[in-house]
A protein has these predicted regions:
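A short acidic, often aromatic-flanked loop/helix-cap motif at beta-alpha or helix-coil junctions
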Residues: 39-41, 135-139, 190-194
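A structural signal for short, well-ordered beta-strand segments and their strand-loop junctions
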Residues: 1-2, 30-34, 70-73, 85, ...
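Metal-dependent polysaccharide deacetylase catalytic core of the NodB/CE4 family, i.e.
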Residues: 1-80, 103, 154
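Amphipathic, non-transmembrane alpha-helical secondary structure
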Residues: 16-19, 23, 51, 55-62, ...
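Active-site-adjacent pocket scaffolds in enzyme catalytic domains
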Residues: 70-154, 158
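Short, surface-exposed amphipathic charged segments that create phosphate/polyanion-binding patches used
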Residues: 47-49, 108-113, 196-206
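C-terminal domain-boundary segment and adjacent tail
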Residues: 26, 147-206
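Short, well-ordered coil/turn elements that cap or connect secondary structure elements
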Residues: 26-28, 88, 124, 178
Length: 206
């Protein structure tokens, strides 16, 4: 099942239209927060307090009546304070990846995990981490081999659906994946998955 992790409307964007789309997505499957800190077209933070914006957006989503349960930081950004904010909001995090995005600098804030894990935070909270394991290209390249990870969690952007080639690759990749693994969704994993691995966020940096 597809989960919609959505960026809240930026200044000047049509909030009513956004809410209409978000409620439609919520009716179809799990809903999550996808924060872009700098601008709609610039995901990773360049200034300010990243965790404060996550809390602000999470509070707004709750105030407008949306049932949000997941988070993915734009540009795969996650630091300790953001992780604390995500845990405070009661979300499950999907920002970690099983791969290192090629555009990130070596010292960029990013969490890399192969399998689901609990993140032990300085506050004493634990955050359930369901890492993203595959891009569209990785799904397509893996068709002829086994998917060895406990959970296969692929991501794509809505703009990928407008590209004929990428949309076709996504459909083929998901179709083959469905023949090899048992379909699930993030809410089922959130409720039922209990990872055996717990790690300190302080020891999970790049």
């Amino acid at each position: 099942m597809i989960a919609a992790l959505m960026r809240p409307p930026a200044a000047g964007e049509n909030e009513e239209r956004w809410l209409e789309r978000a409620r439609e997505a919520e009716a179809r499957g799990p809903l999550g927060l996808h924060t872009h800190w700098t601008a709609p077209d610039h995901a990773r933070p360049t200034a300010g307090d990243p965790a404060a914006l996550v809390r602000e957006q999470g509070d707004w989503l709750r105030a407008v009546g949306l049932d949000v349960g997941f988070f993915c930081g734009g540009g795969w950004y996650l630091d300790e304070d953001v992780a604390e904010a995500v845990a405070e909001l009661g979300y499950t995090d999907c920002t970690a990846t099983a791969f290192k995005p090629g555009y990130l600098e070596p010292d960029a804030a990013h969490l890399q995990l192969d399998e689901p894990s609990w993140l032990q935070l300085p506050s004493g909270r634990r955050l359930l981490e369901l890492p993203t394991t595959h891009s569209i290209g990785m799904l397509a390249r893996g068709l002829l081999g086994p998917f060895r990870r406990q959970v296969v969690h692929a991501y794509f952007h809505d703009t990928d659906l407008l590209d004929r080639r990428r949309s076709a690759a996504l459909r083929v990749g998901l179709g083959f994946l469905g023949t090899k693994r048992t379909p699930s969704n993030l809410e089922e994993l959130q409720r039922g998955l209990r990872p055996t691995k717990t790690m300190s966020f302080a020891n999970s940096g790049p």
